[in-house]
Amino acid sequence: MGKIIGIDLGTTNSCVAVMEGGEPVVITNSEGARTTPSVVSFQADGERLVGQVAKRQSITNPDKTIISIKRHMGTSYKVDIDGKNYSPQEISAMVLQKIKADAESYLGESVTQAVITVPAYFNDSERQATKDAGKIAGLEVLRIINEPTAAALAYGLDKMDSNHKILVYDLGGGTFDVSILELGDGVFEVLSTNGDTKLGGDDFDQKVMDYIAETFKAENGIDLRQDKMALQRLKEAAEKAKIELSSSMQTNINLPFITADATGPKHIDLNLTRAKFNEITNDLVQRSIEPMKKALSDAAISIDEIEKIILVGGSTRIPAVVEAVKNFTGKDPSKGVNPDECVAVGAAVQAGVLTGEVKDVLLLDVTPLTLGIETAGGIATPLIERNTTIPTKKSQIFSTAADSQTSVEINVVQGERQMAMDNKSLGRFTLSGIAPAPRGIPQIEVTFDIDANGIVKVSALDKGTGKEANITITASTNLNDDEIDKAVKEAEKFAEEDKKRKEKVETLNNADQLIYQTEKALTELGDKVSAEDKAKVTEKLEALKAIKDGEDLEAIKKATEELTQEFYAVSSKVYAAAGGDPSQAGGFDPNAAGGAQQEPHDDNVVDADFKVDDDK
């Protein structure tokens, strides 16, 4: 069985880990970093960038750079790039493809299976969309687990002999979750979960952006938010200021030539204090308090019973957030986990549980939202209450609302509101063939089945006729099987293009390196090389130079090999008499051409890894 990777597919950054020797290890990406920006950028020539290289050029290419796509998972949102629409699943799959490739490079083997985390408060549509993204990227998603639960796994793996209750406060780039868990004897039981899928670090950035923009507008009469390039510079500066204010009491925001008018160029030079930052973002911090209260209430425990507070997500580095949690709980948060990496580490632990590498661990998670159906009068009738341990299955008997009714439409809803229309409709299906009878007589058994991923299946059975209908919830906002298959094929095609482009870059790197080494060595050896031998080497050298910028990679490889062999033969003659090492001829190393492949930070090699020409 191959390795199963654990992926934290984040709003702002993503992280991947794997179990090695019984311990979870965070995998560094091709740029040498432990996290990868969840950013995708499309270039004018159709090429595609993912990760840090995409983020670096977002200011100059704001229209075709996609950030925070996770906030649109499970919705009908589309990204229009040059007339082609991309779903959130497809954009997320591009990020997952890079993560998958980085993991394969690290492990030295193909990776086809993964455990992916989602915010605990993600609904069914959002979970299904995440699973679809994995499939498009070429990954079989064995398990979807909640981020706070994953963090608890990372925290509690070495503390399984003790019994205690913990509160996980997870404030990421785009979502907020809070979960109450009980740990003991290898069992990680989620008692309750709550959250806000529209609260995260992006919102803190937006507050700072608005503050800068309003200050500038008051002074200059220009709204920078109407200029896409200026807006992107504002976003980058706001994020940088937020990060700096986590460790400093004041930061300077300096953006020269941000715009211009008839009077000339305009600049931003603004000092932002931590006190001011806390003031403009206080409402966001306070929004996280109510979900904590609800989670404690649902778990039926008091704050005094919580023994440990775990902070997860990069946004928990904001001092005001830490202070708010401390004030609410009366406890100092634990420093035992890395907020950026612990979710991926926990996902890797869960992967280890699935493979049997991690033993004596049982994870009991819950469904975050109430599930039910719409009944007479538009009422949402619950079947499975929120915070029910999953997997679970529950049935309930319903009947017809009219005389001689031969079919019923069942509207599956998810949410906490009393009326069905106020909740999220996950899907509809029809049970036909009901025997005509007075209303209230037919017995229709509706069954909800939630698997360990939190994904829902619903069935309806007419107990009188035996007629049955069922639905695996795939809301209209998700991709159907044909769309997923099409996206998978496109992703495979792009992966093949990536492979070819990388091979081309490496072949050209090898040729360039060899040409440089040969010319350098010939100059340094001078008269030690006979005219006849020099002519032979020069002939092969010129032959390689003539074709190295062409498209025939096999010819370039052949010419590279021929030049290598020819020069090695010549240098052997020169050094044989002196008893030297021919590989040291003028610093020449016949294998040095391959050295270009060993430089992971070479821009050409790295960028080629994840550029795709959509027109091919």
UniProtKB/Swiss-Prot annotation:
It comes from the Bacteria. SUPFAM superfamilies: Actin-like ATPase domain, Heat shock protein 70kD (HSP70), C-terminal subdomain, Heat shock protein 70kD (HSP70), peptide-binding domain. One of its GO terms (molecular function) is unfolded protein binding. It holds the Pfam family HSP70. The keyword Cell membrane does not apply. Keywords: ATP-binding, Chaperone, Nucleotide-binding, Phosphoprotein, Stress response. Gene3D superfamilies: 1.20.1270.10, 3.30.420.40, Actin, Chain A, domain 4 (3.90.640.10), Substrate Binding Domain Of DNAk, Chain A, domain 1 (2.60.34.10). Induction: By stress conditions e.g. heat shock. PROSITE patterns: HSP70_1, HSP70_2, HSP70_3. Residues 579-616 are annotated as: Disordered. Residues 599-616 have a biased composition (Basic and acidic residues). CDD domains: ASKHA_NBD_HSP70_DnaK-like. The modification Phosphothreonine is found at T175. Belongs to the heat shock protein 70 family. NCBIfam families: PRK00290.1, prok_dnaK. Acts as a chaperone. This is Chaperone protein DnaK. It comes from Clostridium botulinum (strain Eklund 17B / Type B).
